[in-house]
Regions:
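Structured mid-to-C-terminal alpha-helical surface segments
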Residues: 3, 7-221
Length: 221
């Protein structure tokens, strides 16, 4: 479970509310029989908990909850999505707008290139989620924003040209086999090499920065 704290407030207010959130989540999980694992951690801007429990099959299992407190303000307003689960009542889930959500995924793919990142971005391309010029412009601008403020690049310098994607090229099939395939449906086929090719082609066309965007990146660097 990956959450963002989205209250626009100063650090002192955030820390106060953060403690309330901590207490509420820990109390709820413990009352439902989940046990906090020793590996849980709470660094400066992140709460990361791992809870152990016994699943319906009687096996030991775990659930991870992470709350990010550094990205409190977003580009676009959050949206509410209705989620239908067959054996539960319908629920509303608050999430980032699709454009902003996939901008963060593209940033993660370029920076760290986890197996799930290429899967998510490939499905965005495959299903043509953003087809109009306006949508693609918004996606590019949001991506450029997160490439600067949320970059995981080791050299901390955001490029202004994107003609190749070395981090994506470093992904190997053993990563896909061990990290991605176990969580996909058995009937789902994921063509890894095709996904890499199509994603890199899409990104090379998307990330053609305007002069003003290049100037923004240079000033930020």
């Amino acid at each position: 479970i990956d959450l963002d704290f989205t209250v626009d407030c100063d650090r002192e207010s955030m820390l106060s509310i953060r403690q309330e959130v901590n207490n509420e989540i820990l109390r709820y999980m413990e009352s439902d029989g989940y046990h906090l694992a020793p590996g849980s951690k709470t660094p400066h801007t992140l709460d990361s908990w791992v809870f152990h429990y016994t699943n319906a099959a009687g096996n030991n299992d775990g659930i991870k909850i992470e709350i990010n407190y550094s990205d409190r303000c977003h580009i676009q307003p959050a949206i509410e999505t209705h989620v239908s689960i067959p054996f539960l009542s319908d629920v509303k889930v608050r999430s980032l707008s699709p454009v902003e959500l996939f901008a963060t995924k593209i940033n993660a793919l370029i920076g760290r290139s986890a197996a799930r990142d290429i899967y998510d971005v490939y499905n965005m391309v495959k299903h043509q989620l953003f087809v109009s010029d306006e949508e693609k412009t918004l996606l590019r601008k949001a991506t450029v924003f997160y490439l600067t403020v949320g970059s995981s690049r080791k050299d901390n310098a955001t490029p202004t040209e994107y003609t190749d994607f070395p981090q994506i090229d470093k992904i190997r099939f053993p990563q896909i086999r061990s990290q991605l395939l176990p969580v996909l449906r058995r009937s789902e086929h994921f063509d890894f090499e095709k996904a890499k090719t199509e994603v890199k082609d899409f990104l090379s066309k998307l990330l053609v920065l305007t002069e003003s965007e290049k100037e923004y990146v240079r000033e930020f660097n």
